[in-house]
């Protein structure tokens, strides 16, 4: 099945503390062990949205009680195409519930620890450069952590489930360029990629119901901060 993230572009919400977690936003804080290495913890508030207007192949077996709204999907599926585009109104019995709606729009919430290295290249490129005023650095790092999504899902007509739950783990690597001003303020651009394994995603209020998924991700990040 296809899914995508939910970019918001350049928006004032990124500068509004009351709304900055609505778009995809990252937060990180850390400590420099020495001039080159630092360790940090952070939250990558990425989003994952299942493409509802699609046909996907389904394999498995559904056997719900006839009284359940989702019993219309009872049967055996062997790579069977299912149309996920169903407009559902719970007050209209003529519209059946969708087979599945699924998204992590309140965040994939990759909570991770990173170890990074930073090297000053401005003094090497420009011999007379005053790095006390503006310092240009390259940075790279590795990270790992857990996934704490607030998954919004509705499966086979069951009640919607939308709660935070530890659902898996992730690993990541990054590389970027850092510009530090007067040794205290910086702007940093990064490319960050990684792998996410989610083997315990809650899909209904019943703890026995769960889903699994894994995927690769790539982020383009612009960060402002202080030292």
Model features per residue range: what roles?
Residues 12-15, 97-103, 155-164, 205-214:
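Extracellular loop and loop/strand-boundary signature of outer-membrane beta-barrel proteins
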Residues 119, 132-137, 147-153, 157, ...:
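Extended, basic/helix-rich recognition subdomains
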Residues 28-153, 225:
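Gram-negative (and chloroplast) outer-membrane scaffold detector with strong preference
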Residues 176-227:
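Predominantly the C-terminal beta-signal and adjacent terminal strand-loop region
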Residues 21-25, 105-111, 136, 165-171, ...:
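Residues that define the transmembrane beta-barrel architecture of outer-membrane proteins
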Residues 1-21, 166:
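Surface-exposed strand-loop-strand hairpins of Gram-negative outer-membrane beta-barrel proteins
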Residues 12-13, 25-26, 44-51, 55-57, ...:
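Outer-membrane beta-barrel domain signature
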Residues 3-10, 87-97, 150-158, 203-206:
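Flexible, solvent-exposed coil segments and beta strand-coil junctions
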């Amino acid at each position: 099945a296809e899914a995508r993230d939910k970019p918001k572009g350049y928006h004032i919400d990124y500068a509004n503390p009351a709304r900055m977690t609505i778009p995809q936003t990252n937060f990180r804080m850390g400590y420099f062990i020495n001039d080159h290495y630092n360790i940090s913890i952070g939250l990558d508030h990425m989003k994952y949205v299942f493409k509802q207007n699609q046909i996907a192949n389904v394999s498995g077996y559904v056997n719900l009680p006839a009284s359940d709204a989702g019993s219309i999907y009872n049967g055996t599926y062997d790579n069977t195409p299912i149309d996920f585009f169903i407009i559902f109104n719970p007050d209209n019995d003529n519209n059946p519930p969708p087979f599945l709606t699924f998204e992590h729009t309140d965040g994939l919430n990759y909570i991770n620890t990173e170890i990074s290295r930073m090297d000053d290249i401005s003094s090497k490129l420009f011999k007379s450069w005053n790095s006390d005023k503006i310092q240009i650095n390259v940075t790279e790092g590795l990270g790992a952590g857990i996934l704490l999504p607030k998954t919004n899902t509705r499966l086979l007509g069951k009640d919607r489930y939308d709660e935070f739950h530890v659902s898996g783990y992730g690993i990541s690597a990054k590389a970027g360029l850092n510009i530090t001003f007067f040794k205290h303020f910086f702007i940093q651009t990064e490319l960050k990629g990684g792998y996410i394994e989610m083997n315990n995603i809650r899909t209904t209020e019943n703890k026995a119901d769960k889903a699994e998924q894994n995927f690769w991700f790539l982020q383009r990040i612009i960060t402002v901060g202080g030292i």
